[in-house]
């Protein structure tokens, strides 16, 4: 059998090794100059005024919700077809996640679904830029402005995604992920961008014990060695080891995403003759980052179920992923919201399958996946 082809693999090279070596030899390995450089680089990428690096996108979501003072009695609108961390953070703060349906073919939450879910208790809207494509963020922000509701963009899939000529996050507040399978990675990490100076100041405090400044700031700027605790906070800072890797990856972003796009195009051409349905692309002008390549496996149409397809691919040495099982079908949320029905979300949750997609894949690797799909479709 051929070597196992994983669903994803980080694209690491000598540059990342050199970046880590530099940090280790510098004597400053926790939050420091590499964090500052990463934040500045993201501001240049997105055009935002502020960037705050954190230990994970989940941490970023947690402190953003906290900074917006979301808590008991509040509602936050978000799709169910997302990773559960968003729902978990909303719930842990005592608020209620209001899960809405998505478009059947793009898997994007729609402005119409969001607006229909607004109540006097709605405190925030969290759209997801799904799989590397952008949601219709102008329309969603317009709803937020009309009702006076904050919009927090879940941009975990969207490093390198553009909407109408603007990088995701521009002129708003968005949270990116540097998890191991993301378009750029430092194993674990995240980053928040915003143009809201007050929000940025609160996020910096909340991510580091509620202190007004961190240790590197105190050393660099000659401040008093004992900083003041201004509010209870968390330990969500990113180390410079991680930041150095992320910064090196960011410099490669165009190359990494170009390779993802080439593989996605190879899949798209082959799938035109197969019953497996890829996601539709959004109608608005955009640049897709191709974080994921997702097909829908409908048993009646394809002659095989999604789970059987994933198992058959595994037997052929090909890994796959599931992004995502709908959050409202998970035990905790199913029991909390037993009557919730989201038809498009549920239909897709039972059929979606993520194919291998990462920059170090070869054309032959993609051909191997395509050949297996052709065999399993009976063609």
From Swiss-Prot:
It comes from the Bacteria. Its EC number is 2.6.1.87. Keywords: Aminotransferase, Antibiotic resistance, Lipid A biosynthesis, Lipid biosynthesis, Lipid metabolism, Lipopolysaccharide biosynthesis, Pyridoxal phosphate, Transferase. One of its GO terms (molecular function) is UDP-4-amino-4-deoxy-L-arabinose aminotransferase. Its cofactor is pyridoxal 5'-phosphate. Pfam families: DegT_DnrJ_EryC1 (PF01041). Pathway: Nucleotide-sugar biosynthesis; UDP-4-deoxy-4-formamido-beta-L-arabinose biosynthesis; UDP-4-deoxy-4-formamido-beta-L-arabinose from UDP-alpha-D-glucuronate: step 2/3; Bacterial outer membrane biogenesis; lipopolysaccharide biosynthesis. InterPro entries: ArnB_NH2Trfase, DegT/StrS_aminotransferase, PyrdxlP-dep_Trfase, PyrdxlP-dep_Trfase_major, PyrdxlP-dep_Trfase_small. GO terms for biological process: lipid A biosynthetic process; lipopolysaccharide biosynthetic process; response to antibiotic. The modification N6-(pyridoxal phosphate)lysine is found at residue 182. One of its GO terms (cellular component) is membrane. It is an enzyme of class 2 (transferase). Belongs to the DegT/DnrJ/EryC1 family. ArnB subfamily. Catalyzes the conversion of UDP-4-keto-arabinose (UDP-Ara4O) to UDP-4-amino-4-deoxy-L-arabinose (UDP-L-Ara4N). The modified arabinose is attached to lipid A and is required for resistance to polymyxin and cationic antimicrobial peptides. PANTHER family: TRANSAMINASE, UDP-4-AMINO-4-DEOXY-L-ARABINOSE--OXOGLUTARATE AMINOTRANSFERASE. This is UDP-4-amino-4-deoxy-L-arabinose--oxoglutarate aminotransferase. It comes from Escherichia coli O139:H28 (strain E24377A / ETEC).
